[in-house]
Amino acid sequence: MVIQLRPERGGYIRPFGCGWFIREFLLGHGPEGAAVIDPEIGACQEDIFFHYKKAIHRAYAEDAVAWENEERIKKGKSIYNEEEYNDRFDYFLSRIPYKLVKCRYHSFQRYFHWLKQLGWVEFTGKEEKASMQDYYPDAPPRRFYRLTKEGKSAPNQEWSNPQLTLYPERGLDYFREKRSQRKYSRKAPTKSRRKTSSGS
């Protein structure tokens, strides 16, 4: 029997999960080349989000270089040496726009809010002035959060989907039904993907 391995419609493919990254970052492990923090001091949401996005960018750049190496192998060429690899990695990394990755800060805020509702992260009491407060004094300050005992002991499966953990009555069938109500449209092909005639 042949099983088709095809992703379902909706959602985004990520080299690593948002929940996994948040937990590893707040544990002070510096996941995927991110900065190492003091787990007791914690970090603010804005910084975690920034390091998460940059880590995904690095993973994308690594995948691009890996694809080039695969093409070189197919052509009978040797793979990049360390210096060449680093040059190609820097090349791709410098050309990834910050907003290319689909995760937006609003989505990250919602994700982090679920973690707070579950009691997996807690406010440390430390605050810093946000740059926005320079021209809008009523803006909220930068608040630091750290993992709680419950957050450290929560299993990976729950960290990967805190919304389902928080609202177990909303299972996969609920989200499938919601997706079926949406209208998906195909994006217009880019110039490089359009079929050109042999004469062009």
Residues covered by each model-derived region:
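Short alpha-helical segments that sit at the start of domains
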Residues: 1-82
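Short, cationic-aromatic polyanion-contact patches
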Residues: 126-156
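Short amphipathic alpha-helical interaction segments
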Residues: 100-118, 122-125
